[in-house]
Amino acid sequence: GVIFFGLMLTENGPKVLEYNARFGDPEAQVVLPRLENDIVDVFEACIDGTLDQIDLKFDNDRATVCVILASDGYPVSYEKGFVIDGLEKFRDKEDYYVFHSGTKFNGQGQIVTNGGRVLGVTANGATVKEARENAYKAVEEISFANKYYRTDIARAVDEA
């Protein structure tokens, strides 16, 4: 199973905000790209009750960082329907993943924003620092009106 803890670092140490018996988002977006098993085999084993017979393997030689691209104003109030450009740059790019969340196709077949959390831009690297650099470079390749993202993801690694 999976247990997910939502934590916040405070002056008095970490505080638990929530916990769930499922993957969180974007937590799954940094774990699943490192899964070496075929995900279909894993899901079928879950369905068949044979997950204990699967030797789950993960790529532990690389680090992964995910930066969420959101609509400015999220979570309170934001506009939708802005065309997203740059996604084609990641179609065959190894070690980069763009996970859709708040997107849809408009009437012209373009991918547009359709929610507060729009995309999860995930990148691998040899170290957390390199994965962070790669993720933020990838974030710059994607554009849409009212794009917002945090600039402090994995920053503690740079400051260490």
Functional labels for PLM-detected ranges:
Residues 1-3, 20-93, 106:
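Active-site "cap" helix and flanking loop/linker of ATP-utilizing ligase/carboxylase catalytic domains
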Residues 1-9, 151:
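A short glycine-rich, hydrophobically flanked beta-strand micro-motif that places a catalytic Asp/Glu
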Residues 3, 15-17, 117:
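Protein kinase-like catalytic core scaffold
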Residues 9-25:
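Conserved phosphate/anionic-ligand binding catalytic regions in large, soluble enzymes, centered on
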Residues 9-11, 58-61, 91-93, 111-117:
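A structural signal for short secondary-structure junctions
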Residues 92-102:
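Hydrophobic alpha-helical segments of multi-pass membrane transport proteins
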Residues 103-108, 112-160:
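Generic C-terminus detector
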